[in-house]
Amino acid sequence: MAFNIDASNHTLDALLEIVCVNLQLTETQDQRARGHYASVANWLSREGSPLREFSPHIFPQGSQRIGTTTKPFGRSEFDLDAVCKLMLTDECHPGELYQMIWDRLFESATYRPMMKQMPRCIRLEYSGDFHLDIAPAILDEEHGGNCILVPDLNANLALLHPENDCWKSTNPIGQADWFEDQCVPVFVLNEKYARAQVDPVPEKEAIHAKPALKRCVQLYKRWRDVEYADRPKLAPPSIILTTLSGRSAGTSTKASNSVPTHLSQFLTGRFRRSNRTNDLG
């Protein structure tokens, strides 16, 4: 069945607006994520924490940072990704950094049963449909700026193989700033967080004030959830969808505040490429 997107179709416009509204987290879900983040950040950084001497800088990254989180689909969960950066050099072994933050979380009777080891983060699995991922990190002195190094652990934490463990360079703050620059502003939003110990999760944007690009990313992510529901391991990660969307916006000759117009331009091009190269799965 051919799928044709017509940007002038007012019915499609209205339908996509309705979908966008329904993709937003509920107020309860949003406040729940913020509350859990604040509690974990406080536990990691407060007075008496063994991490305190390393000046922990805790900040959100990913979808919650840029406002593109979507309501869970089917049995999926929504999450909040965070970074806990310590003032250490890369002479510290990746596994040692991971262990330091793991041990601090393990000290909490609340977090201990919720902890799950992931290759580049520690996951806290809450009851219901939410989990919080905490990525240990240090400053990436080679690349500078906001770049950080995160552990990439290929072995079980209890059986570390140092020769297989390494650092991965990433820049979640830079990625978020770049994405915000691609957004067509509904209003000027250029707030910069001070270098505080714990950065708050950015305030939730009302749907009518959310830039078109952010709504497009949410729609694309829901398309991904539906399209790959029976093959989740093949689903493109959110960072890829976000980057492709941002690049599409950056090459547009005319900015648009219309979600359907922007989305149609982006998806039409991708679907045409997909028909030729099957690059969308």
Regions of interest found by a model, annotated:
Residues 84-88, 249-252:
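Short beta-strand-to-loop capping motifs
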Residues 16, 76-85, 192-203, 221, ...:
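Glycine-rich, often proline-containing surface loops adjacent to acidic residues and nearby aromatics
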Residues 44-48, 66, 98-156:
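Conserved catalytic core of two-metal-ion nucleotidyltransferases
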Residues 50-52, 57, 95-103, 200-209, ...:
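Short N-terminal edge-element motif at the start of the domain
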Residues 72-74, 85-90, 102, 142:
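Extracellular/secreted glycoprotein ectodomains characterized by long, lumenal stretches
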Residues 204-281:
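Conserved nucleotidyltransferase catalytic core and NTase-mimicking acidic/glycine-rich helix/loop elements
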Residues 1-77, 89-96, 121-124:
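N-terminal regions immediately upstream of nucleotidyltransferase
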Residues 70, 135-207:
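Extended, alpha-helix-rich binding/interface surfaces that flank or overlap catalytic cores
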